Curated annotation (Swiss-Prot):
Family (UniProt): Belongs to the small heat shock protein (HSP20) family.
UniProt subcellular location: Cytoplasm; Nucleus
Keyword Heme: no
Primary location group: cytoplasm
Protein name as catalogued: Heat shock protein beta-3
Top-level taxon of the source organism: Eukaryota
Gene3D superfamilies assigned: 2.60.40.790
C-alpha cells in the first residue's frame, strides 16, 4: 500500500486513515469534513459523510422533527497544538470561561531560534462546570476539549 503524504498542515491523515483508504486522495483533498480545524462534532461528521448517498436522502425526508434540546450539538473544541508538549499546555476554567494556554521556551529550528505561545478563551455553555469537561491530546497533535458524555444522560 502506498503512503499518502499531505502537505497542508491542517489535514490529519492519521485520524481519517480509513476514509483515505475507502476514497481516492483527490476526493478527500477538498473534503472539509476531514480538516481538523475547525472541527465538526462526531455527529456532524457522520452526517456529512453519508449526506450524498440516496439512502441518506431518503432518511432525511422521512425523519421526524426532534424535540427541543435533542438536536443540539455538544460543546467541543479542537486545537492544533502539535508544536507543544503536554506539559506546555494549561487548561483552566474561570467564571464561565474556558482558558487554554500553551507556551514553550526558545528552541532551535531550521531557520534559527523560535518561541511560541497562544491563549484561547471560549464561553462555556450554561450549566457546564470544570468537572463536566474532558481533555484529550491525540497522537496527531490535536487537543480535544469537550463535555463528558455522561452530562445530560439521565
Amino acid at each position: 500500500m502506498a503512503k499518502i503524504i499531505l502537505r497542508h498542515l491542517i489535514e490529519t491523515p492519521v485520524r481519517y486513515q480509513e476514509e483515505f483508504e475507502a476514497r481516492g486522495l483527490e476526493d478527500c483533498r477538498l473534503d472539509h469534513t476531514l480538516y481538523a480545524l475547525p472541527g465538526p462534532t462526531i455527529e456532524d461528521l457522520s452526517k456529512a459523510r453519508g449526506a450524498g448517498t440516496p439512502q441518506a436522502l431518503a432518511e432525511d425526508s422521512a425523519s421526524t422533527e426532534k424535540p427541543p434540546g435533542e438536536g443540539k450539538s455538544r460543546f467541543q473544541i479542537l486545537l492544533d497544538v502539535v508544536q507543544f508538549l503536554p506539559e506546555d499546555i494549561i487548561i483552566q476554567t474561570f467564571e464561565g470561561w474556558l482558558l487554554i494556554k500553551a507556551q514553550h521556551g526558545t528552541r532551535m529550528d531550521e531557520h534559527g531560534f523560535i518561541s511560541r505561545s497562544f491563549t484561547r478563551q471560549y464561553k462555556l455553555p450554561d450549566g457546564v462546570e470544570t468537572k463536566d469537561l474532558s481533555a484529550i491530546l491525540c497522537h496527531d497533535g490535536i487537543l480535544v476539549v469537550e463535555v463528558k458524555d455522561s452530562l445530560g444522560t439521565k
